[in-house]
Curated annotation (Swiss-Prot):
Its main location: membrane. The gene is lspA. This is Lipoprotein signal peptidase. It catalyses: Release of signal peptides from bacterial membrane prolipoproteins. Hydrolyzes -Xaa-Yaa-Zaa-|-(S,diacylglyceryl)Cys-, in which Xaa is hydrophobic (preferably Leu), and Yaa (Ala or Ser) and Zaa (Gly or Ala) have small, neutral side chains. It is a multi-pass membrane protein. Its EC number is 3.4.23.36.
Length: 151
């Protein structure tokens, strides 16, 4: 049950931040948070993370739905809380972006914008962060905890 609440919290955090951006920053505008490093930039992405598969909405929506169902299955199949938390984070992020893909025809709202010297990292959002951090936690689980669970 706690994992359903966590997933809902991850989705809510993502959607709330996107709502704040859409209501307060004009599309394409950039607000400096830390000069030459971190900006809030209202952008839309019609593809997947980091701009791959542009205009791939009709592929990304059904793939996300199928993968989300699989993730729910694995959350309830495994009893390890670390594993379940990792998958909950991934699912919360996936559902946050799925909501945008279904209800925003102009793309997923992105706004976290980082620059490192001459390198400009692709603009992303809180949902993307949840997916990446959840995936890193899942990798950690697979490499270091899974073996202990099997003993």
């Amino acid at each position: 049950m706690i994992f359903i609440v966590l997933i809902a919290a991850f989705v809510a955090a993502d959607q709330l931040t996107k709502y704040i951006v859409v209501r307060n920053i004009e599309f394409g505008d950039k607000i400096s948070v830390i000069d030459n490093f971190f900006y809030l930039t209202h952008w839309r992405n019609t593809g997947a993370a980091w701009g791959i598969m542009q205009n791939g909405r009709y592929i990304l929506v059904p793939v996300t739905v199928v993968l989300s169902i699989l993730i729910v299955y694995f959350i309830f199949k495994n009893s390890n809380k670390f594993y379940r938390f990792s998958l909950s984070m991934i699912l919360g992020g996936a559902l946050g972006n799925l909501i945008d893909r279904v209800f925003r025809t102009d793309g997923v709202v992105d706004f976290l914008d980082f620059q490192f010297g001459n390198y400009h990292f692709p603009v992303f959002n809180v949902a993307d962060t949840f997916v990446v951090v959840g995936t890193l936690l899942l990798a950690y689980y697979t490499l270091f905890i899974y073996k202990e669970d099997k003993k």
